Swiss-Prot record:
Protein name as it appears in the record: Bifunctional purine biosynthesis protein PurH
Transferase is among the record's keywords: yes
HAMAP family for the chain: PurH
GO biological processes: 'de novo' IMP biosynthetic process
Xref: Pfam families: AICARFT_IMPCHas, MGS
EC number annotated for this UniProt entry: 2.1.2.3, 3.5.4.10
Tagged with keyword Transferase: yes
PROSITE patterns found in the cross-reference section: MGS
Signal peptide annotation: none
Species per Swiss-Prot/TrEMBL record: Escherichia coli O139:H28 (strain E24377A / ETEC)
Length: 529
């Protein structure tokens, strides 16, 4: 098998034309003959490049509104022909070898994402000739280079220059892998789209079956290998979606520190997603995927100081997330006060990075500013299966709350209730959060009984000398018994926010009235397992 193959003839047919003119110019300048189709050929000709239309090469016109362009033996024979083995038959049928295929596919994902996209629109954006050429070239990678990503254009030209116009087998093989990944992802999108429409298509319903197709095809790209997984005996890697539309741990840039661990990434995700809930300057400190301190204030420095005070013991070795730029003063406060694994923020000032650089092991990530939250899917692996659900983006405002007790909450109690309700959404169930003056003062997480989460929150507040009297308490789900209210009242809580919906709601409300507690129902639950 020849290790290097000279590139003498290339076929270019792309939907995404970013960089294609410059790439074609570079190929042409190196003596490569250009074949092309449709809009790509017109663009290259407009730029003064010598290009042969595929229809002129095959002697067969494009037809059926462009549905049939490249499905021809002179095209696929030129791609699939085995050099040194099929030369005679190629010569007999006047088939010229094609050494490089540059193809990206019709924008199916963008089409079906458009509001009002019809089935007909989707069908017309299913590429046939493109994937066929991609697979043909990838199959024959020992002789042909297949290019599906514009990000590879520069590297390909450089390698050709380093190898007298040739590409190595290693490069062709790597490009083939990318090509098969590309077509697999493309077919998966189409299968998912049509799979979700089966009932509607067969006339069983006028509505689509929903966002859950009968076969779920997922495509993620490996971002990095991990030293190990959740535990040292487990191997692990981090995979991300190709086109993430929201600032996240997956899109974040690490600007300082040693490599992220599996647990670092999981905890950073928990911290970042929580801090996104707040419009005011906010700080979230997470340990083992649970918030251990959260606060909002007029500055991230004060927010950090108050979040830290919730539970300094748990904050040791934690993950810290901000929703504003990390500044020098805040960075200095963190470094001077505690050991921290990861700091993530939309951005970080140069001065802040100089300060954190003094602690080389501290990982600093910037993720960019986020806008509206993007709907998507959450996954949970079970043995032999996968649970899939919509992301929990639900959140209630003050106008949606129902006061179910005799006493109305004060303005501050209401603010604190809404604040700790946002935090409770990110605490493992059973979740109880005590808050006062826009900071958490006690968090009870992950207990099997709700009353013990309430007791733990009170114990934590007492241990840190934080006053519970006049505070608000959030519960991620309803109280099955009044004991959780009794525990909160004993600690000093005066306002409770919870979903409601228990068969014993009357008893729970009565307990609140007995203690003079204001109680708010959200009619929305936030279990987190």
């Amino acid at each position: 098998m020849q290790q290097r193959r000279p590139i003498r003839r290339a076929l270019l047919s792309v939907s995404d034309k970013a960089g294609i003119v410059e790439f074609a110019q570079a190929l042409s300048a190196r003596g490569v003959e250009l074949l092309s189709t449709g809009g790509t050929a017109r663009l290259l000709a407009e730029k003064g490049l010598p290009v042969t239309e595929v229809s002129d090469y095959t002697g067969f016109p494009e037809m059926m509104d462009g549905r049939v362009k490249t499905l021809h033996p002179k095209v696929h024979g030129g791609i699939l022909g085995r050099r040194g083995q099929d030369d005679a038959i190629m010569e007999e049928h006047q088939i010229q070898p094609i050494d490089m295929v540059v193809v990206n596919l019709y924008p199916f994902a963008k089409t079906v994402a458009r509001e009002g996209c019809s089935l007909e629109d989707a069908v017309e954006n299913i590429d046939i000739g493109g994937p066929t050429m991609v697979r043909s070239a990838a199959k024959n990678h020992k002789d042909v280079a297949i290019v599906v990503k514009s990000s590879d254009y520069d590297a390909i030209i450089k390698e050709m220059d380093d190898n007298e116009g040739s590409l190595t087998l290693a490069t062709r093989f790597d490009l083939a892998i990318k090509a098969f990944e590309h077509t697999a992802a493309y077919d998966s999108m189409i299968a998912n789209y049509f799979g979700s429409m089966v009932p509607a298509y067969h006339g069983e319903s006028k509505e689509a079956a929903g966002r859950f197709p009968r076969t779920l095809n997922l495509n993620f790209i490996k971002k990095q290998d991990m030293r190990y997984g959740e535990n040292s005996h487990q191997q692990a890697a981090f995979y991300i979606e190709e086109n993430v539309k929201e600032a996240s741990v997956a899109t974040a840039t690490q600007v300082q520190g040693k490599a992220l661990s599996y647990n670092n990434i999981a905890d950073t995700d928990a911290a970042l997603e929580c801090v996104k809930e707040f419009a005011e300057p906010a700080c979230v400190i997470v340990k083992h995927a649970n918030p251990c301190g959260v606060a909002i204030s007029n500055s991230i420095l004060d927010a950090y100081d108050r979040a830290y005070k919730t539970d300094p013991t748990s904050a040791f070795g934690g993950i810290i997330a901000f929703n504003r730029e990390l500044d020098a003063e805040t960075a200095q406060a963190i470094i001077s006060r505690q050991f921290v694994e990861v700091i993530i923020a939309p951005s970080a000032s140069e001065e802040a990075l100089k300060i954190t650089a003094a602690k080389q092991n501290v990982r600093v990530l910037t993720c960019g500013q986020w806008g509206e939250r993007v709907p998507g899917l959450d996954f949970k692996r079970v043995n032999g299966g996968l649970l899939v659900q919509d992301r929990d983006l639900g959140m209630v405002g003050a106008e949606e709350l129902r006061v179910v007790t005799q006493r109305q909450p004060t303005e501050q109690e209401l603010r604190d209730a809404l604040f700790c309700w946002k935090v409770a959404k990110f605490v493992k169930s059973n979740a109880i959060v005590y808050a006062k003056n826009n900071m958490t003062i006690g968090i009870g997480a992950g207990q099997m009984s709700r009353v013990y989460s309430a007791k733990i929150a009170g114990i934590k507040a007492a241990d840190e000398g934080l006053e519970v009297k006049g505070s608000s308490m959030a519960s991620d789900a309803f109280f099955p018994f009044r004991d959780g209210i009794d525990a909160a009242a004993a600690a000093g809580v005066t306002c409770v926010i919870q979903p409601g919906g228990s068969i014993r709601d009357d008893e729970v409300i009565a307990a609140a009235d007995e203690h003079g507690i204001a109680m708010l129902f959200t009619d929305m639950r936030h279990f987190r397992h």
